């Protein structure tokens, strides 16, 4: 039995609140249960120096957690003077995931900066960030299209979403919350496109190694869960 009472293949309640920020070209407050992340997409009419005059754009991402997003207050990373390895890993993952479904030449020599700020954390912050960031990116590109800057369908080639899966109490389960994640025997994150392409898989055995059969079970859970998330994204942008 999962602590939340959910079935092994049951995700937490997921919601997307678009245009949460009035300033950003695209924004979305995404909720995976009690994990809440504000994702914004900001347009810059420039690219990094190493991309100048290359005829293509760039998507980059930053990730952070508010001090009281967790049970005990954390120091702001800005106050410590450096980002943790975890933060750097997650923001690179978000950027890679979004670039996988973007035609960078079609964007032109522009950069879209994605900011994912965790307001409240209860497990799965990186997967929620990727899934919500896609909505923010979509809405930023839609804003650009309304100003004849790009064609949305030419830049954004597909959906992308992510979900965590793991082995908890000897059972493969989907969308782990903090209690499950902290006690899981195996923890994995899956990033996939709407058409079923794999973008990234991160999997770690916390205790005993997991078998190929167990991995296949996690993969199936993730595939079905991400298909659900993509449908939710479609419904969100249609509204």
Swiss-Prot record:
It comes from Rhizobium meliloti (strain 1021) (Ensifer meliloti). Signal peptide: none annotated. Belongs to the RNase PH family. Phosphate binds at residues 86, 124-126. InterPro entries: ExoRNase_PH_dom1 (IPR001247), ExoRNase_PH_dom2 (IPR015847), ExoRNase_PH_dom2_sf (IPR036345), PNPase/RNase_PH_dom_sf (IPR027408), Ribosomal_Su5_D2-typ_SF (IPR020568), RNase_PH (IPR050080), RNase_PH_bac-type (IPR002381), RNase_PH_CS (IPR018336). This is Ribonuclease PH. PANTHER family: EXOSOME COMPLEX COMPONENT (PTHR11953), EXOSOME COMPLEX COMPONENT RRP41 (PTHR11953:SF0). Its EC number is 2.7.7.56. The keyword Transferase applies. It catalyses: tRNA(n+1) + phosphate = tRNA(n) + a ribonucleoside 5'-diphosphate. GO terms for biological process: rRNA catabolic process; rRNA processing; tRNA processing. Homohexameric ring arranged as a trimer of dimers. It comes from the Bacteria. Keywords: Nucleotidyltransferase, RNA-binding, rRNA processing, Transferase, tRNA processing, tRNA-binding. GO terms for molecular function: 3'-5'-RNA exonuclease activity; tRNA binding; tRNA nucleotidyltransferase activity. Phosphorolytic 3'-5' exoribonuclease that plays an important role in tRNA 3'-end maturation. Removes nucleotide residues following the 3'-CCA terminus of tRNAs; can also add nucleotides to the ends of RNA molecules by using nucleoside diphosphates as substrates, but this may not be physiologically important. Probably plays a role in initiation of 16S rRNA degradation (leading to ribosome degradation) during starvation.
């Amino acid at each position: 039995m999962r602590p939340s009472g959910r079935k092994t293949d049951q995700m937490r309640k997921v919601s997307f609140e678009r245009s949460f920020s009035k300033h950003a070209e695209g924004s979305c407050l995404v909720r995976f249960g009690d994990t809440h992340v504000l994702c914004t997409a900001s347009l810059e009419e420039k690219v990094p120096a190493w991309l100048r005059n290359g005829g293509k754009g760039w998507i980059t991402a930053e990730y952070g957690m508010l001090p009281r997003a967790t049970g005990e207050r954390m120091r702001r990373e800005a106050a410590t003077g450096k980002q943790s390895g975890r933060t750097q890993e997650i923001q690179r993952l978000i950027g890679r995931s979004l670039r996988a479904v973007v035609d960078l030449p079609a964007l032109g020599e522009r950069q879209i900066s994605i900011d994912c700020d965790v307001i409240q954390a209860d497990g799965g912050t990186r997967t929620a960030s990727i899934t919500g960031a896609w909505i923010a990116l979509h809405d930023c590109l839609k804003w650009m299209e309304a100003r004849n800057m790009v064609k949305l369908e030419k830049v954004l080639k597909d959906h992308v979403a992510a979900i965590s899966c793991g082995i908890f109490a000897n059972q493969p389960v989907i969308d782990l919350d903090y209690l499950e994640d902290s006690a899981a025997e195996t923890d994995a994150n899956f990033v996939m496109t709407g058409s079923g392409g794999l973008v990234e898989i991160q999997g770690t055995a916390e205790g005993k190694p997991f078998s190929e059969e167990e991995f296949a079970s996690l993969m199936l859970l993730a595939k079905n869960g991400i298909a659900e998330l993509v449908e939710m994204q479609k419904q969100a942008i249609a509204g």
